[in-house]
């Protein structure tokens, strides 16, 4: 099991995401639980990012929405950075 660390940006974006997408609140909460239990589960579609976001990873909430994160396997820690639409989090 991993420890989730919410960055200040993630706290703001998670609140905004939940308010603007109430229909996805349960799905978002389930994704966070799944990340905490095992971020390598295939349905999360964990992938590393490239370019200026190199060093970060992303998982899917739905087809259009992503959570960006830093995965520290040795420390069993995941730092959550942002959540939002594909184009928003990859800007």
Outline where the language-model segments fall.
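Residue-level recognition of oxygen-bearing side chains
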Residues: 9, 54, 88
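Short alpha-helical linear motifs
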Residues: 30, 51-54, 69-72
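PIN-domain endoribonuclease scaffold, especially VapC-family toxins
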Residues: 5, 25-33
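A short, surface-exposed loop/turn module that caps and links secondary-structure elements
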Residues: 34-59
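Enriched for short, Lys/Arg-rich terminal
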Residues: 3, 12-25, 61-91
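Short, charged low-complexity linear motifs
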Residues: 2-3, 51
């Amino acid at each position: 099991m991993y420890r989730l660390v919410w960055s200040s940006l993630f706290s703001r974006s998670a609140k905004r995401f939940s308010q603007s997408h109430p229909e996805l609140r349960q799905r978002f909460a389930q994704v966070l639980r799944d990340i905490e239990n095992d971020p390598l589960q295939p349905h999360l579609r964990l992938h590393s990012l490239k370019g200026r976001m190199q060093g970060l990873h992303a998982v899917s909430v739905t087809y259009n929405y992503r959570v960006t994160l830093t995965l520290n396997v040795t420390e069993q820690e995941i730092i959550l950075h942002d959540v939002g639409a594909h184009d928003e989090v990859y800007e």
